[in-house]
Amino acid sequence: MLAVFDLDDTLVDRSSAIRRWAQLLVGREGMSADAIGAIVGIDRDGAAPRDEFLAVVHSLPGMRMTVTELRNWYAGSYLSCYGVEDESIRALTTLRAARWKIGVVTNGSQERTTEKLTHAGLAPLIDALCVAAEVGVPKPDRRIFDEVARRCGVELSGWMIGDAPVEDIGGGAQAGLRTAWLRRGRRWDGEVPPPDIEADSVLEAVATILNADQRINTW
């Protein structure tokens, strides 16, 4: 069986990482504490292109670095804001013990994705990684799901676990996967058909998936 995971705010806590980075920057530059929330908002959950994000951050009151200095400092400091993801390690270890294949599909960059997985302690637990920039198509395109299944050496059948309604849940469902949505304090908004299950954590999602699989196998 195949379990496909999103990366940011699914396997790794990106929201906390960008807030940690904002705190580091504000402390370094002596900026107002209010700038932390502003920086997190400018990031838009990672949707803001990095050059745009850093240009707007540079315009905030109290910034002393030049744009180039800020870019270089971001490149050297951001990934250090990610830590070991104990809960995700437990979830993936449980799946592997049950002989599931584990794939990761992300629209992020290849270099940063690999480094995030390493920082989180997840790299040894993953069978295949598909990054949109490397594969040539982003989620929710079915082809990136086909590719992660191919790299795992299994048919495209199983589950997609993620936090993004369109890219993860909509894309996974269109690819024929069952879907698990990580709520992150939100309610389902009906933008695409609802997920098969909702959960508050990766560990909860995996436990529910394994219970569902066990029930199917005992029928």
PLM regions: where:
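Asp-based, Mg2+/Mn2+-dependent phosphohydrolase catalytic module
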Residues: M1, I89, T93-R96, K101-V105, ...
